[in-house]
Regions:
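Generic cytosolic/nucleocytoplasmic N-terminal low-complexity/intrinsically disordered segments
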Residues: 1, 15, 105-106
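Extreme N-terminal leader/targeting segments of oxidoreductases
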Residues: 1-9, 27, 221
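N-terminal Rossmann-like FAD-binding beta1-loop-alpha1 element of flavoenzymes
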Residues: 9-34
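Conserved N-terminal/central alpha/beta ligand/cofactor-binding core
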Residues: 37-233
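A conserved short coil-to-beta-strand element within the FAD-binding core of flavoproteins
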Residues: 236-237
Length: 237
């Protein structure tokens, strides 16, 4: 049988998990393609806050955070009904999660930041922590995507500062400072708003509300750029 196209691996979907698997399959020697049923890529990963929960990740370790595999294990077991998750899956998540982040950091454009004040959902549970397990993507200038920028699914309105025509992106760390009106929030807002206004000509040129991509958009953009470096295509609708 003759095919129009031939690939070793076809990845269906274009969220964080799908694009990460595409990177790994390519790096493992497989000819890879990503297909997305809609006319935009990124899925719910793009609209989300972009956070990734990995205990004992490299970014937390760089800040000498006090955590352990046992604490992570105790926490996961405390928030899941007994027997709901197989022990081997929990062990794999705890042991391989940090390795995945290491691989992406060292072999792609995917970079994260430690969220030192983003607590586990149940921090008082056994093994729970007040922060340093979740990460968010490093912001990135969206114009580096070129025409693919227009195909990136937009962030959820709640993950940006919106007022009339103004739609200004912020990171989770910045959002905590701004929404909580914590010390320094006025200075931060003035800085972000000034950059936003001064960038108006370029934003109008690219047809994008804010070229500074953060949260889920930043994570997807970095994955897409990493696939572009590998000449792996993403076919949309």
């Amino acid at each position: 049988m003759k095919w129009d196209y031939e690939f070793d691996v076809v990845v269906v979907g274009s969220g964080n998990g799908a694009l990460t698997s595409a990177i790994c399959s390519h790096d493992g020697g497989a000819k890879t393609l990503v297909i997305e049923k809609s006319n935009q890529y990124g899925g719910t990963s793009a609209t989300s806050g972009g956070g990734v929960w990995i205990p004992n990740n490299r970014y937390a370790k760089a800040e000498n955070v006090d955590d352990s595999d046992q604490d992570a294990r105790d926490y996961i077991n405390s928030v899941s009904p007994e027997g709901m998750i197989k022990d081997e899956l929990i062990e794999t998540y705890i042991s391989e999660g940090p390795k995945m982040i290491d691989y992406l950091h060292e072999n792609s454009q995917v970079k994260y930041r430690n969220l030192s004040h983003y607590p586990d959902y149940f921090p008082d549970n056994p093994g729970g922590k007040e922060g340093n397990r979740s990460m968010e993507p490093e912001p990135i200038n969206g114009t580096i995507l070129g025409t693919d920028l227009g195909k990136l699914r937009e962030q959820h309105p709640q993950t940006a500062f919106t007022m009339g025509p103004i739609n200004m992106n912020f990171t989770q760390v910045e959002g905590q400072l701004l929404l909580g009106a914590l010390p320094g929030w006025k200075t931060l807002f003035a800085k972000l708003f000034t950059k936003y206004i001064l960038d108006l000509p370029m934003r109008l040129k690219w047809g994008w509300k804010d070229r500074r991509l953060t949260m889920g958009n930043a994570g997807i953009a970095r994955l897409v750029l990493s696939l572009r470096d590998r000449n792996v295509d993403i076919w949309t609708e």
